[in-house]
C-alpha cells in the first residue's frame, strides 16, 4: 500500500500546482520502503512513519504551492525559492551541495559554499578567506585547523567548526547564522543569505597621533566590505619607469589590469606600476598635492537623510571622506595617501565599525589553516622600518600536502599569462604564490621550470632556483644547466639554452615540452631537426617569414644563432647524442624546479650577489613589493610576500634577504615581484586587493588532500 501511494501521488497531481520532491527523492523513498517490506528488521517502523510524514508534508504543505515560475535571472528566484537537497549523501557525513556564489542581501559575491549532513542535520559552510572579504568576518589566531575563532561585532570570539577540502576551508556558520537571524536559501549553485536590516545611528571622526579614525555607530551587526578603487592618473614623465625585470624587452607592454581583459584587441592597457599602492614621489618641485588613492567601505545598512547631509572633514592623513547611498547599502568613500591601507574592524556593545587610517595597517594573524599549512601575517622590523609580511609555512612531509609548479595554459601551451587567482582556481590548489620571471610580449617563461623531471623552461643567467621532491627535500642555489651535443664524428657542441625564451648567440635546444612547433625569435636562425638521435633536416628561419617548425615527438630541434659553422658538424643522416648535467649536480635528482633570483640566503647567511645573476645595478637598488620562498631549519617551506614598509616603499633585495633571514630561513630565494606579487589561500589573495595584482606566467602551488 505504501509503495502504491508513493508511485500514485506523482501521477495523481502531475497537472496540479503542487511541487513534488525530486524524482531522485521518490526513488530513494521507494527503495527504503521496499527494503522494509522485504526485510522489516533492516528498516525500523519509526523510519517508515517518518517517511510517510515527509511525503505528506512535502506534497500538501502550503509552502509547496507553485508561484508563477520566474526566469533564472529573476531576483524572486534567488530570494524566495527554497530548494533544499535531502539526498542520502547530504544526510551523511560528506559534502554534497556545493557552489561558488552567494547572494548577500541581493548582491552577488563569489564565495565558495558547501552543505553537509552531520547527525541528520544539514550544516552550511562558507569559504573562510572569501567570507572575510564578503562580510567583514575577521579570522583570529588558532592552532586548531578544525576550529576557527572569529570577530564580527563580538564581545567574545565565537568559535566556528570547519571542514577542509582540497581547495577550501569552510566555516560552519549554521548555529552562528541562526543566532544572528540570518536566512539561508539554496538555489542551484547560489546560496542566498539575508541578514536583518540594519541602520546607521551616527558617524564620528577624530584625529589621532598615528593618523585618523572614523567610527560608524550601528543599531545591529551587519555585513561590510572594503574595496580598493583607484589611484588618480599620474602626470606624464619624460622617462618611463623601469620594468620589473630588466631582462624583459624594453618594448614590452605593461601588464594590464584585470579589467583590461575585456577590452578589444588593439586597445591600450592601463599602465600598472610594480606596486599600485606604492607611495608616489613628486615628479618635480611644482607638485603640490601628494598622490592619493580611493577606498570604499560598503555597509549593508541604511542611513537617514539627516545623517547623510552631515559634513565630514579631512584629517591628518585622511584627505577626504564622503558618504553616499547605493540601494540599501551605505558607502563610505575615503581618500588616503598612496601606499596606505585602511584598517577596518568591528566592536560590540554598542555595535560599531571602526576605520583607522594609519601607516601600520596590518592585522597580525597566526592561523593553522590545515595540518601542515600555517597562514601568518606580521611585521618584520629592520632598524626603524617595519615591513608587513604575509606568508604560508608549509610542511612538505605532512601527509596530503604536495608542491607543484602551476601555469596559465600548460599542458595545452607553455605560453600565456593571467592572474594568479585564475591559475590557482584552474589548478585546484589550496595555496599558491607567483613564481618565475617571464617575457611580457610573448608571454613565455624566463627561467627554470622543471616538471616531472622534464625541462619546460631551462635555467638562465646563473640565477637562483628552488628544487624539491615529494619526500619533502628542498634545495635552493644558483643553477646552471650544461648540455653538450656529441656528434658522430666525436665533436662536442655546447648547448647554452634548453626550451628558453632568453635569446642568446649559440645553440639552443627545443624539445616537445616546448610545444608542437617552434617559431624563430631572430633572423637567420639555422634549424636542425633530430629524430631518434639522428639528424634528419636543415632549415633556415626568420622572424619576418612567420614560419613555424615542427618539433618531433621522438626528438628535438637545435637552433643555431650566429653560429653557422656548427651546421657542418650536424650532417643529415649522422647520429648525435646529448649529455646533460646540472650545476649544482644534486639538482638533477629533483623532479620539480622553479627559477627566480637573486639567491638571498644560504646556511642562514645573506649571500646576495645580484650582479652574479645578471641583474643590473639599477634593479638591485630598486624598492618594490617582493615575493620569495625559503626553507627553515626544521625543513618547512616559507612562501612569502613582503609589502611596503609602514609609511614608505617596499624592500630592496638586501632588505628582503634580511627579512627572510629574520623569519628563520636557512635558504631563501627571491621570486618575480612588484605588481606580480600575489599570495593565495583558499580562494582569495591574502596580501593585496585582487584588482591591483598583475598577470603572471607561472606560480608555485600547494596541493592539499584531506
Locate each region found by the language model.
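Conserved, well-ordered active-site substructure
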Residues: 442-460, 464-468, 593, 600-666, ...
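Loop/turn positions that initiate beta-strands
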Residues: 570-579
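Short, Lys/Arg- and Gly-enriched loop/turn segments at beta-strand edges
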Residues: 365-368, 581-593
Amino acid at each position: 500500500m505504501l509503495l502504491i501511494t508513493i508511485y500514485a501521488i506523482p501521477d495523481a497531481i502531475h497537472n496540479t500546482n503542487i511541487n513534488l520532491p525530486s524524482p531522485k527523492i521518490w526513488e530513494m523513498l521507494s527503495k527504503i520502503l521496499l527494503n522494509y517490506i522485504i526485510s522489516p528488521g533492516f528498516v525500523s517502523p519509526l523510519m517508515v512513519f517518518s517517511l510517510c510524514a515527509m511525503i505528506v508534508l512535502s506534497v500538501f504543505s502550503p509552502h509547496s504551492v507553485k508561484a508563477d515560475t520566474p526566469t533564472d535571472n529573476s531576483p524572486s528566484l534567488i530570494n524566495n525559492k527554497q530548494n533544499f537537497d535531502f539526498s542520502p549523501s547530504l544526510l551523511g557525513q560528506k559534502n554534497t551541495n556545493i557552489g561558488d556564489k552567494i547572494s548577500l542581501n541581493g548582491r552577488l559575491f563569489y564565495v565558495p559554499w558547501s552543505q553537509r549532513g552531520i547527525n541528520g542535520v544539514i550544516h552550511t559552510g562558507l569559504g573562510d578567506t572569501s567570507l572575510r572579504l564578503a562580510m567583514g568576518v575577521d579570522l583570529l589566531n588558532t592552532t586548531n585547523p578544525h576550529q576557527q575563532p572569529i570577530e564580527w561585532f563580538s564581545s567574545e570570539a565565537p568559535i566556528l567548526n570547519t571542514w577542509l577540502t582540497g581547495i577550501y576551508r569552510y566555516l560552519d556558520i549554521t548555529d552562528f547564522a541562526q543566532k544572528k537571524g540570518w536566512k539561508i536559501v539554496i538555489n542551484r549553485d547560489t546560496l542566498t543569505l539575508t541578514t536583518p536590516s540594519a541602520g546607521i545611528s551616527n558617524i564620528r571622526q577624530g584625529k589621532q597621533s598615528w593618523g585618523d579614525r572614523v567610527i560608524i555607530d550601528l543599531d545591529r551587526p551587519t555585513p561590510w566590505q572594503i574595496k580598493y578603487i583607484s589611484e588618480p592618473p599620474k602626470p606624464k614623465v619624460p622617462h618611463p619607469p623601469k620594468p620589473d625585470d630588466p631582462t624583459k624587452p624594453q618594448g614590452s607592454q605593461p601588464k594590464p589590469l584585470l579589467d583590461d581583459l575585456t577590452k578589444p584587441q588593439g586597445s591600450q592597457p592601463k599602465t600598472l606600476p610594480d606596486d599600485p599602492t606604492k607611495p608616489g614621489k613628486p615628479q618635480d618641485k611644482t607638485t603640490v598635492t601628494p598622490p592619493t588613492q580611493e577606498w570604499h567601505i560598503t555597509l549593508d545598512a541604511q542611513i537617514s537623510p539627516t545623517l547623510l547631509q552631515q559634513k565630514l572633514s579631512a584629517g591628518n592623513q585622511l584627505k577626504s571622506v564622503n558618504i553616499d547611498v547605493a540601494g540599501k547599502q551605505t558607502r563610505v568613500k575615503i581618500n588616503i595617501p598612496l601606499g596606505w591601507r585602511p584598517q577596518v574592524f568591528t566592536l560590540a556593545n554598542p555595535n560599531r565599525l571602526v576605520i583607522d587610517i594609519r601607516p601600520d595597517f596590518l592585522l597580525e594573524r597566526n592561523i593553522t589553516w590545515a595540518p601542515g599549512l600555517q597562514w601568518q601575517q606580521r611585521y618584520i622590523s629592520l632598524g626603524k622600518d617595519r615591513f608587513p609580511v604575509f606568508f604560508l609555512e608549509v610542511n612538505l612531509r605532512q601527509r596530503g600536502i604536495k608542491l607543484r609548479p602551476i601555469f596559465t595554459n600548460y599542458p595545452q601551451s607553455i605560453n600565456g599569462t593571467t592572474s594568479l587567482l585564475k591559475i590557482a582556481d584552474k589548478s585546484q590548489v589550496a595555496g599558491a604564490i607567483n613564481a618565475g620571471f617571464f617575457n611580457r610580449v610573448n608571454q613565455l617563461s624566463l627561467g627554470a621550470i622543471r616538471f616531472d623531471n622534464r625541462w619546460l623552461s631551462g635555467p638562465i643567467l646563473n640565477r637562483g632556483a628552488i628544487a624539491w621532491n615529494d619526500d619533502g627535500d628542498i634545495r635552493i642555489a644558483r643553477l646552471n644547466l650544461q648540455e653538450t651535443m656529441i656528434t658522430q664524428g666525436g665533436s662536442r657542441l655546447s648547448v647554452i639554452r634548453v626550451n628558453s625564451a632568453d635569446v642568446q648567440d649559440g645553440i639552443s635546444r627545443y624539445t616537445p615540452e616546448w610545444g608542437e612547433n617552434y617559431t624563430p625569435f631572430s633572423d637567420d636562425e639555422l634549424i636542425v631537426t633530430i629524430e631518434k638521435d639522428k639528424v634528419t633536416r636543415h632549415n633556415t628561419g626568420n622572424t619576418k617569414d612567420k614560419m613555424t617548425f615542427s618539433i618531433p615527438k621522438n626528438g628535438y630541434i637545435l637552433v643555431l644563432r650566429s653560429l653557422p659553422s656548427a651546421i657542418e658538424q650536424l650532417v643529415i643522416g649522422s647520429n648525435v647524442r646529448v649529455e646533460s648535467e646540472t650545476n649544482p649536480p644534486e639538482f638533477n635528482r629533483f623532479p620539480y624546479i622553479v627559477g627566480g633570483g637573486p639567491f638571498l640566503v644560504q646556511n642562514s647567511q645573506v649571500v646576495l650577489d645580484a650582479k652574479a645573476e645578471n641583474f643590473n645595478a639599477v634593479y638591485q637598488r630598486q624598492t618594490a613589493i617582493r615575493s620569495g620562498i625559503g626553507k627553515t631549519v626544521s625543513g618547512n617551506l616559507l612562501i612569502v610576500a613582503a609589502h611596503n614598509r609602514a609609511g614608505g616603499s617596499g624592500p630592496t633585495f638586501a632588505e628582503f634577504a634580511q627579512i627572510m633571514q629574520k623569519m628563520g630561513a636557512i635558504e631563501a630565494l627571491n621570486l618575480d615581484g612588484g605588481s606580480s606579487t600575489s599570495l593565495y589561500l583558499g580562494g582569495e589573495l591574502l596580501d593585496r586587493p585582487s584588482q591591483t595584482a598583475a598577470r603572471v606566467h607561472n606560480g608555485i602551488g600547494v596541493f592539499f588532500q584531506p
